[in-house]
Amino acid sequence: MSRTKGGTVTHARHKKVIKAAKGYYGRRKSTFKVARQAVDKANQYATRDRKNRKRNFRALWIQRINAAVRSHDEALTYSRFINGLNLAGIEVDRKVLADLAVHEPEAFGAIVKQAQDALAA
């Protein structure tokens, strides 16, 4: 039986890794062994940061909402505002609230007023 060499398969696998390392600096873009390590580490970072992106955006939305709420009423805090929304039965998520606070301050002010009324009642 003749010997089977894996040249084409190995070449394709190496080429895939080198292609993924395009734009890297030094041997990280051209040498298979180093490129594979760099690509593996990049994939670890990408996986981790897909999770962190969700946390970061939620934190950003909360900061924006808190700043907007305090600009409408100095005494009202973020947590009391969210409590007021729950008491008023307003079910708007933080992403939409932050967008309203930035782009439509008048509408956000009306929501703040409803939350204050619910807290007072």
Curated annotation (Swiss-Prot):
GO terms for cellular component: ribonucleoprotein complex; ribosome. NCBIfam families: rplT_bact. This is Large ribosomal subunit protein bL20. InterPro entries: Ribosomal_bL20, RIBOSOMAL_L20_CS, Ribosomal_protein_bL20_C. Binds directly to 23S ribosomal RNA and is necessary for the in vitro assembly process of the 50S ribosomal subunit. It is not involved in the protein synthesizing functions of that subunit. Transmembrane segments: none annotated. Belongs to the bacterial ribosomal protein bL20 family. It holds the Pfam family Ribosomal_L20. Keywords: Ribonucleoprotein, Ribosomal protein, RNA-binding, rRNA-binding. One of its GO terms (molecular function) is structural constituent of ribosome. It comes from Roseobacter denitrificans (strain ATCC 33942 / OCh 114). Disulfide bonds: none annotated. One of its GO terms (biological process) is translation. The lineage of its organism: Bacteria, Pseudomonadati, Pseudomonadota, Alphaproteobacteria, Rhodobacterales.
